[in-house]
Design a protein with these regions (language model features):
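Alpha-helical transmembrane segments
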Residues: 14-18
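C-terminal motif of bacterial Sec signal peptides marking the signal peptidase cleavage site
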Residues: 19-23
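Bacterial N-terminal signal peptides that target proteins for export
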Residues: 1-11
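OB-fold nucleic-acid-binding modules
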Residues: 25-89, 93-119, 123-276
Length: 276
């Protein structure tokens, strides 16, 4: 498993800057704010949807059909990811009270339309769900010839928009961060993977293996040796890595030294050989 850490600190700075800017607008009328209201109502939790379309294979693609009664699968959740710092790449993760799921979308700067804390309602019927390298997600079916298997890749942003509605305004205070004290809590059974994949987590009392020595990544690199940095928990477990894109705005920052807490999206990678 791996965590993707990047967006928390950038978002805080953006909020502060917006507050300062707004304070300079005293001489102007405040424009009316149009608050979006979704028409569809959720009838399925994220956990229920993930279980209904789960397959144990590392890669697969399946269409989301209607329910036995003919109704659509409709979920809702709040956005927990952000690509503002160019570390999260072409995907959006949302959570509800039961779980989290990722949408693979072929677009940059998704944070401009889907802010952290924004609730979105998704009509999942007619979409495609599956796995790419072990991570369950929504996307577009593609055939992986080397592995002789189907998987899901990036869906078009237009297709994504046709299936979603914004509901209300972003509220980061309503996001739920799950606190973890040991990597051993990350169960890799099917049930455990459905629970943990794509979740927003805080891992307490961890340190980087190369803290104070290496940087988060290397410029524009995609090599695993460059972008993956080993994290060690309080029990000495080292089966979680922090993955930082070579395009991230903080790629050249030194890994912090000493123990601390880290917040990020918990992802998962599994090769066709079964290693992870």
């Amino acid at each position: 498993m791996k965590t993707v850490k990047s967006y928390i600190f950038g978002l805080t700075a953006a909020i502060a800057m917006s507050t300062v800017f707004a304070a300079c607008q005293d001489d102007f009328d405040t424009p009316a704010i149009e608050v979006p209201t979704a028409v569809n109502q959720a009838n399925t939790t994220i956990a229920e949807l993930k279980e209904a379309f789960w397959q144990d294979a590392s890669n697969y693609a399946d269409s989301v059909r209607t329910k036995p009664d003919g109704s659509h699968y409709i979920i809702k959740g709040r956005v927990i990811s952000s690509d503002e710092q160019s570390n999260v790449f072409k995907n959006i993760s949302i959570q509800d009270e039961t779980g989290a799921i990722t949408f693979s979308v072929n677009s940059y700067n998704l944070y401009l339309n889907y802010r952290r804390g924004q609730e979105i309602v998704i009509d999942a019927t007619g979409m495609y769900i599956g796995k790419y390298a072990g991570l369950q997600q929504f996307g577009t079916p593609s055939y992986y010839e080397n592995g002789s298997t189907w998987q899901v890749g990036f869906m078009s942003p237009q297709f994504f928009r046709r299936h979603l509605e914004l509901n209300g305004v972003p509220d980061v205070e309503k996001l739920d961060t799950i606190t973890v004290n040991s990597f051993s809590e990350f169960d890799t059974s099917a049930e455990g993977l459905r629970k943990w994949q794509s979740q927003l987590v805080r891992i307490n009392n961890v340190h980087f293996q190369d803290g104070g020595v290496k940087t988060f990544s290397e410029y524009h690199s995609s090599s695993n040796d460059d972008v993956n940095k080993t994290l060690i928990d309080s029990e000495g477990n080292s089966n979680v890595v922090v993955r930082t894109s070579g395009y991230a705005t903080f790629w050249n920052k030194k890994l912090p030294e000493g123990n601390g807490d880290i917040v990020g999206i918990l992802s998962f990678y599994q090769s066709l050989s079964g290693s992870s």
